[in-house]
Design a protein with these regions (language model features):
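N-terminal beta1-alpha1 cap of cysteine-dependent amidohydrolase-like domains
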Residues: 1-59, 64-74, 121, 126
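A conserved hydrophobic position in a structured secondary element of the catalytic/binding core
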Residues: 45, 78-79, 132
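Active-site oxyanion/phosphate-handling segment shared across diverse enzymes
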Residues: 120-136
Length: 136
């Protein structure tokens, strides 16, 4: 059986992570229910809206299987809301998986409507970049 990276795909930017894995020819599977967790060898908890992501804990089966896999030691990446899910101390009191020994402040750099796109010039090259609010 081929092992794959599991990408939590309940909400958020899971498709962008899949595109990155495709670039390096890494097998992946989207985790949408607890059965999808069985055959993964690494895990990505993507960014998105952290309040929505935290709701995975309402589904104890997914929550417990994710915790078991992470506690077994599989490599795990959390970006933005995924980091919030992993942290053991969220300053605004939101519940998390409590795996990573860190303190996180949600929306520390502003709210959703504080995100913007802007032109940046570096080494005489100008490109459009997206600036998003993020946890700290």
């Amino acid at each position: 059986m081929v092992m794959a990276t599991g990408i939590l795909a309940l909400q958020g930017n899971f498709r962008q992570h899949a595109k990155s894995l495709e670039l390096i020819n890494k097998e992946y599977t989207f985790i949408k229910n607890s059965n999808d967790i069985e055959n993964i060898d690494s895990l990505i908890l993507p960014g998105g809206e952290s309040t929505s992501m935290i709701k995975i804990q309402e589904n104890e089966e997914i929550f417990n299987k994710l915790l078991n896999k992470i506690n077994e030691g599989i490599p795990t990446l959390g970006t933005c809301a995924g980091l919030i899910l992993l942290s053991n101390d969220v300053l605004d009191g939101k519940v998390s998986l409590g795996i990573l020994n860190c303190v996180v402040e949600r929306n520390a750099y502003g709210r959703q409507n504080d995100s913007f796109e802007g032109l940046v010039t570096f080494n005489k090259n100008t490109q459009m970049y997206c600036f998003i609010r993020a946890p700290r």
